[in-house]
Amino acid sequence: GPLAVAINAAYMQTYIGGVSCPYICSRRLNHGVLLVGYGSAGYAPIRLKEKPYWVIKNSWGENWGENGYYKICRGRNICGVDSMVSTVAAVHTTSQ
């Protein structure tokens, strides 16, 4: 399921689409989002291969980003996205 993550949202404010890799983004966390998926797409000229990314669902509505979603580079803790991750685990108990 989705993971709750914290991120630095400075570069999210101007995002309109594609895979965002703001390497100069601070890792100071200031916004909560949901990590809902991952993938790889596009051409990364530096490495001559596809760019892996996380798919983030934001709370700013469907008119922001790609219908309310954000793709950010995966694997380098860009904007602190890998720093604070939370999930919920269900515990099933039996009653006697």
UniProtKB/Swiss-Prot annotation:
Query: Do you know which PROSITE patterns this protein is assigned to?
Result: THIOL_PROTEASE_ASN, THIOL_PROTEASE_HIS
Task: Give all cystine bridges in this chain.
Answer: 25-79
Which residues are named in the active-site annotation? 31, 58
Does the keyword section mention DNA-binding?
no
Superkingdom, natural source: Eukaryota
Q: Which GO terms describe its biological process?
A: proteolysis
UniProt record similarity statement: Belongs to the peptidase C1 family.
Question: Which PANTHER family did the record assign?
Answer: CYSTEINE PROTEASE FAMILY C1-RELATED
Protein name per UniProt = Cysteine proteinase
Tell me which species this is from. Answer: Carica papaya (Papaya)
